[in-house]
Each structure stands twice: as C-alpha cells, then as structure tokens.
Regions:
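Terminal-region recognition feature
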Residues: 1-98, 102-196
C-alpha cells in the first residue's frame, strides 16, 4: 500500500513538474485531527531536504484547524519555491481554504470543496464535552463563526438593541464559554479578516 502511494506521488510530481508535499488530516469520528502548529517542524525537516525548488505542490485534505499554523505553513512553503500550488482531491475547509488562498494556483477535482474560514478554537478552557462526562480533558471546540452568529441573531433577527440586554446576552454566553476563550474568538476573527 505504501509502495503504491509513493508511486502515485511520483506520478503526480511528474505530471505537475513539481516537488510534492502531502498533508492530510483525519476526519474519522473519534480520530479527528486538525491543522496544528506542531506540524511546522515536520514540514521544515522535509523542506530543508529540498533545495530551493521552482515549484512545490501541496496535496491537501483537511477539515481545518489553527489559522495561524495554516498561514505559517503557507509562508514557510513559499520560502522554498518560486511557485506554490495546492492540489485538492476532496476537502480543504476552513484553515485549508486559507492555505489554498496563499498559493499561486489551486487545482481541484470536480467534487473538491473549499469552505468558509471558520476555525474552531480548542483549549483547556473550552466547555467540557457532556458526551464524555468521565473525561475532564474532553472539551468541545468553539466555532468562531457560531459565536458571531449568536450575536447576529440577537442584534439583527431578534432586534435586541438596548445595552443592558446585550450585556445580559454576553454574561449568559460567558457562563457557558470561558471569557478568555471568547477573547480568543474575537482575536481569531480579527486575524482571519486580516489574512483572507
């Protein structure tokens, strides 16, 4: 199986006239992985083994992850090539979309999808996952866009305008989601607007 995969990678390199890097995160229930800063060292090791290339192709499959890690990865790869392209066979959502937007070229199959840049924050301060009550480490991810959507619902759809009611909504939310996580949501949203 590995031998077949490596042969396919060589074929892609030949077809694209490029050096190929592969980054796949998992989305199988219970085994989900995301774009994370810890991958940068692995990419540095691979890229250091290459000389400066004319073109690098990143084969990417991901549901997303840390936006800063995605942006850092894009900048890292661009240091090692004149042309950077992303090859998407299926999904490059959220932070994967951000990586793709940083490339010179995006190549997608007919069924491939990009998605909104909607990172989910994961930290020890996130709400505990009620489906895993015996594991205090099990935390729910907090979607940046879901928090924004909650406030948009209150302000626009429900037309709540007075300061006290908005304060009560914020207090209620901060009882469910730690205030420092809410601060990270704001920071992440600002960061996304700057990058994308």
């Amino acid at each position: 199986m590995l031998k077949d995969r490596l042969e396919n990678y060589k074929k892609i390199e030949k077809l694209r006239n490029s050096k190929l890097l592969v980054y796949i995160t998992g989305d199988r229930p219970g085994f989900e992985t995301q774009i994370h800063p810890e991958i940068l060292d692995y990419f540095i090791n691979h890229l250091d083994n290459l000389k400066k290339e004319r073109k690098i192709t990143l084969l990417l499959y991901t549901r997303g992850g840390n936006t800063l890690a995605a942006w850092s990865l894009t900048n890292l790869i661009r240091q090692f090539c004149d042309e950077f392209e992303v090859l998407i066979p299926s999904k490059a959502h959220s932070s994967g979309t951000l990586i793709s937007l940083g490339a010179n070229t995006i190549i997608m199959t007919k069924q491939a999808t990009l998605g909104p840049i909607d990172p989910s924050l994961n930290s020890p301060l996130n709400p505990q996952n009620p489906q895993v009550p015996n594991n205090p480490q099990a935390r729910l991810p907090v979607s940046v866009e879901s928090i924004k959507g909650y406030f948009e619902l209150a302000k626009k759809d429900l037309q709540i305008k007075d300061t006290q009611s908005i304060a009560n909504i914020l207090i209620g939310l901060s009882n469910q989601v730690h205030p420092l996580v809410l601060g990270d949501v704001y920071r992440s949203r600002t960061h996304i607007h700057m990058l994308a």
